[in-house]
């Protein structure tokens, strides 16, 4: 009897044959599972790690957040610890410098004895911002009616520019008496002639001198003398007394009153001896 026949005879008389076959099958299954698992690991090792996985892994390593440590803390302590460990990059920075590279500086032009000043808003403003810019310029120009802008002090504050100056009010009762002469015997009066100023008595109506010319003497090079009269500022006697019911101390005082009434006093006193 050959060996195969002997094996069959032995197996036929083996009491634990079923159990042995089951153990053999389970052993074979475990061997195949281990083989497939080892094969999968080897295949994964040959493939490069995806870029998104690398970025996520590196970003986690950049933070000080320690999940293992936080699990040991109370809920309140976890919140405090988490706030302490927030990355600096998450903080919002509002201090962003803004520059207008295409901004055009103001341009002063002169044509035929007239001057013009062109102002240009910064490029890139919205429609609302442009309107706000225009209203700011208009407000500055409007303020020149009440003071001399050239005499104002500019305060450069942290959040604004502030102009400070002496307010000019057209108060007729406080008109400054002229120290310059006005001579009645001459048809032309000067604001810079020697002698005491002409005092007007109660019987003399200053408006009777409405057509009398008064010469304003220039005090700046390049500015010519100018002659003015009351009718340059007032259209009628009623208008004259409606502006200043108390009248003026002299003819030059009335001229100064007219300059203030027309909002020209600040400009005139910069150019002429009043």
Swiss-Prot record:
Residues 54-65 have a biased composition (Acidic residues). It comes from the Viruses. One of its GO terms (molecular function) is RNA-directed RNA polymerase activity. CDD domains: VSV_P-protein-C_like. Residues 171-193 have a biased composition (Polar residues). The N-terminus is disordered and is involved in binding N(0). The region of interaction with the L polymerase is necessary for transcription. The hinge region is highly variable. The central domain is involved in oligomerization. The C-terminus is basic and essential for binding the N-RNA template. This is Phosphoprotein.
């Amino acid at each position: 009897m050959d060996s195969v026949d002997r094996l069959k005879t032995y197996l036929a008389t083996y009491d634990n044959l079923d159990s042995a076959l089951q153990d053999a099958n389970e052993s074979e299954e475990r061997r195949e599972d281990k083989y497939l698992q080892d094969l999968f690991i080897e295949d994964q090792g040959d493939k490069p790690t995806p870029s998104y996985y690398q970025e996520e892994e590196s970003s986690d390593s950049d933070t000080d957040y320690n999940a293992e440590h936080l699990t040991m803390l109370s809920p309140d302590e976890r919140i405090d610890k988490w706030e302490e460990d927030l990355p600096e990059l998450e903080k919002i920075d509002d201090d962003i410098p803004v520059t207008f590279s295409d901004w055009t500086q103001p341009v002063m032009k002169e044509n035929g004895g007239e001057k013009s000043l062109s102002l240009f808003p910064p490029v890139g403003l919205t429609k609302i911002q442009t309107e706000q810019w225009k209203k700011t310029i208009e407000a500055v120009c409007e303020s020149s009616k009440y003071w001399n802008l050239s005499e104002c002090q500019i305060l450069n504050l942290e959040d604004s520019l502030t102009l400070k100056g002496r307010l000019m009010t057209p108060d007729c009762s406080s008109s400054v008496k002229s120290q310059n002469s006005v001579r009645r015997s001459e048809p032309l009066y000067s604001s810079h002639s020697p002698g005491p100023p002409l005092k007007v008595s109660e019987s003399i109506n200053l408006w009777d001198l409405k057509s009398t010319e008064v010469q304003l003497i220039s005090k700046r090079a390049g500015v010519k003398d100018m002659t003015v009269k009351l009718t340059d500022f007032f259209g009628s006697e009623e208008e004259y007394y409606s502006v200043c019911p108390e009248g003026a101390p002299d003819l030059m005082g009335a001229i100064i009153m007219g300059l203030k009434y027309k909002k020209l006093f600040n400009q005139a006193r910069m150019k002429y001896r009043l």
